[in-house]
């Protein structure tokens, strides 16, 4: 049976990996300075990680841009003229 300390350490490590916190940055070995010195297989892995990283950043950018574009724009100087605009009143009757 495992000791409680080891079990806690394994649990924390697993949660960090699953939540993506441990993948916050590119590995130091994938730095462009060291990339030429790496074996071909590790170079392929670094390229794959870089592509995933770029796709993730692009998705975050697109999601953020779509969110900002869908925010309502209020212009208080112009009153609405459309017929579809209806004011509803909720609360006690007088």
UniProtKB/Swiss-Prot annotation:
Protein name as annotated: Myosuppressin
Listed transmembrane segments: none
Main location: secreted
Cellular component per GO, a single term: extracellular region
Family: Belongs to the myosuppressin family.
Subcellular location: Secreted
Disulfide bond annotation, renumbered to this chain: none
GO terms for biological process, alphabetical: neuropeptide signaling pathway
High-level lineage: Eukaryota, Metazoa, Ecdysozoa, Arthropoda, Hexapoda
PTM annotation (Pyrrolidone carboxylic acid): residues: 81
Alphabetized UniProt keyword annotations: Amidation, Cleavage on pair of basic residues, Neuropeptide, Pyrrolidone carboxylic acid, Secreted, Signal
Signal peptide: 1-24
Residue ranges listed under propeptide: 25-80
Protein species of origin: Camponotus floridanus
Organ and tissue specificity: Expressed throughout the nervous system (at protein level).
Modification type Phenylalanine amide: residues: 90
Protein role: Myoinhibiting neuropeptide.
């Amino acid at each position: 049976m495992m000791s409680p300390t080891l079990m806690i350490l394994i649990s924390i490590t697993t949660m960090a990996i699953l939540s993506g916190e441990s993948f916050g940055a590119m590995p130091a070995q994938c730095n462009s300075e060291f990339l030429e010195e790496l074996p071909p297989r590790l170079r392929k892995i670094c390229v794959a990680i870089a592509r995933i990283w770029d796709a993730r950043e692009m998705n975050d950018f697109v999601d953020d841009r779509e969110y900002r574009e869908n925010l309502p724009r209020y212009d208080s100087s112009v009153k609405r003229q459309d017929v579809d605009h209806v004011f509803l009143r909720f609360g006690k009757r007088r």
